[in-house]
Amino acid sequence: MTMTDPIADMLSRVRNASNAHHDTVSMPSSKIKANIAEILKQEGYIANYTVEDAKVGKTLSLELKYSNTRERSIAGLRRVSKPGLRVYAKSTNLPQVLGGLGVAIISTSQGLLTDRQATEKGVGGEVLAYVW
């Protein structure tokens, strides 16, 4: 069966693994998932990620990040733009997550950017997800 929303599947896997305090989580890989993982790493939500090449297909593995007391660095993830209801934002109305404490991941003409990067560059696009 084909997957209708691979990004939502990725976010659900990360959320479930984080809630269960797993150290790593694996999923099928794609370019957009690797770009989302890169943003999560840059923003300090995950420790690292690797793309492993297998015989069947590529696998993306994320190393989740926790504090010394095993408190999660990802408090929440939410898919915003869905296949049935796309959400777009202009460069002047880019959303802020928790007053700037979280990150909005936005697909722009210049690739995937955070809300802060998109504001700096003056570009809008499709709001993929919120991370806080």
Swiss-Prot record:
Q: What Gene Ontology cellular component terms go with this record? A: ribonucleoprotein complex; ribosome
A GO term (biological process) for this protein?
translation
Q: Which residues form the signal peptide?
A: none
Record bears the keyword Kinase:
no
UniProt xrefs under SUPFAM superfamilies: Ribosomal protein S8 (SSF56047)
Keyword Ribosomal protein on entry: yes
- What molecular functions are annotated in GO for this chain? rRNA binding; structural constituent of ribosome
Q: Which Pfam families match?
A: Ribosomal_S8 (PF00410)
Q: Which UniProt keywords apply?
A: Ribonucleoprotein, Ribosomal protein, RNA-binding, rRNA-binding
Question: Subunit structure of this entry?
Answer: Part of the 30S ribosomal subunit. Contacts proteins S5 and S12.
State the family it belongs to: Belongs to the universal ribosomal protein uS8 family.
UniProt function note: One of the primary rRNA binding proteins, it binds directly to 16S rRNA central domain where it helps coordinate assembly of the platform of the 30S subunit.
Q: What is this protein called?
A: Small ribosomal subunit protein uS8
Q: Which organism is it from?
A: Corynebacterium glutamicum (strain ATCC 13032 / DSM 20300 / JCM 1318 / BCRC 11384 / CCUG 27702 / LMG 3730 / NBRC 12168 / NCIMB 10025 / NRRL B-2784 / 534)
Name of the gene encoding the protein in the UniProt record: rpsH
